[in-house]
Amino acid sequence: MVKLLKKLTWKDFILAAVAFVFIIVQVWLSLTMPDYMSEITKLVQTKGSKMNDILIAGGKMLACALGSLLAAVCTSICASKISSNFSANLRGQVFHKVQSFSMEEIGNFSTASLITRSTNDITQVQMLIVMGLEVLLKAPIMAVWALCKISTKNWQWTASTGVAVVVLLSFVCVCVAVALPKFKKLQSLTDNLNRVTRENLTGLNVVRAYNAEGYQQKKFNDANDELTKTQLFANRTMGTMMPGIQMVMNGLMLAIYWIGAYLISNAQMFDKLTIFSDMIVFTQYAMQVVMSFMMLVMIFVLLPRASVSAKRINEVLDMPLSIKDGTKENGIDGKKGEVEFRNVSFCYPDAEKDVIEDISFTAHKGETIAFIGSTGCGKSTVINMIPRFYDATKGEVLVDGVNVKEYTQKALRNKIGYVSQKAVLFTGSIKSNVAYGDNGTKGFTDDVVKQAIETAQAKEFVDKTEGGVDAFVAQGGSNFSGGQKQRLSIARAICRHPEILIFDDSFSALDYKTDRVLRDTLRKTCADATRFIVAQRIGTIRDADKIIVLDDGKIVGMGKHNELMETCEVYRQIAYSQLSKEELA
């Protein structure tokens, strides 16, 4: 928690200092009111007192109450501004950090957990800051100030208040000690419930297709029940605080009045009024002490959860990055568009075996390099090393003659147009999706966007869509078919005019005719770009300049289609499983 609070700016500390001044004023005015109450009590009991004197004392008491209220409002405004600025900055830092994560770091958490940490956890810390400035500063000041005032009164009253304070502290500490472990568990259970809910929503069609609603409901109920039980235990434990404090407060009042009655009964007549007046004042001060502890209870309710949330936020912010920026912006002259793999191997964290092993090849400017092989043989892993989604554990990957680790990530990725296996569209318009991202230019003109759409064979359906390139795209592109989303994703990559185009099984949602026309168009319009294609269909890659066949993470064949049909058994088996001998001829 302290580590996060260090992220407060100097402006926040100035506001905190202003809030502290208002708190001092508020406490002083609140603790002055009992003095005027004592004065009014004496005036009422004294013969010959003027009503004007009572009204003046009452007016001063009212002024103190209004002043205390105004100071409390000012404190609240300062606290709200500090907490809002802090949470906004913290959310920005978490988002920026997550943006820097590689697939390895994201895998260490989970999407559901990262969302919870970026929203709910930061809100918990924000609430603690608000309550901390409004209550945590005020309560100790109020308690100490009030105790100093009552210490000058009767020692029996002071002793009874001291006993009440010790009982309160012990009770609160026990409650917090019991509830804290449950609050720590609560956040992980919330992550689990979010994960189950997210899985169900994203896979709803599969769930329905297999009539698995009952199974999913059971998973949700189990996660929900465990979360509910933990919440109930934690909330019940913390919920006993208020009744416990109320009981102590009532017991303290009873003790004060009992002691007061005893003192008054044994006092001389002229001392009875003074003792009675002191008892009224002492009761008010004692209640201020107890109220201070009641305010602290509000902090203790928030503190366990906020402490856990702060730890989870720090886990994200302190996560070391496996992919670090280099310093170079440009490659070697004369090597533009060239990609080389030198004895590259890669192993996922905690895995025992390399996913790919000793991969070596060179792709020259303008060439089409295709990858094919069985599912899980490492095709996507190989091409994901070019934009540094993963870094090689052995060997080197070079772009334009420079190791990719030496580039800044921005400079490297400005050279690349990437189309993922699953087409990803963002909420906005067709134009905003095609012209998406920063490639080092000031933006894309409408003509460039339309040309990219035409090259990607998306012009026909875009023209038919109401609004054309300005047509609305729903979240995830849910208002477009799989093939349409795939073509718009391809248009987005083409629009950048990159040195390197990467298609990670990006033609799978296209029909054979569109696939063929698109590849022919790419060969003409993107002739200077080095093209990498991962595919399962022989028809998609048979015209490539170089086909790399992978099996169990190793290269088992490399060459053109006709060469591989003669020399590579794995390629030949894949080819014959899809096409007849006549079609392959």
List each model region and its residues:
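Transmembrane helix-loop-helix hairpins at lipid-water interfaces of multipass membrane proteins
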Residues: 10-74, 78, 151-156, 262-276
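An intracellular "coupling" helix at the cytosolic face of ABC transporter transmembrane type-1 domains
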Residues: 11, 100-104, 120-129, 133, ...
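Alpha-helical segments in transporter systems
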Residues: 14-36, 57, 61, 76-80, ...
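Juxtamembrane helix-loop junctions of ABC transporter transmembrane domains
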Residues: 21-22, 29-38, 42, 55, ...
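ABC-type nucleotide-binding domain
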Residues: 332-585
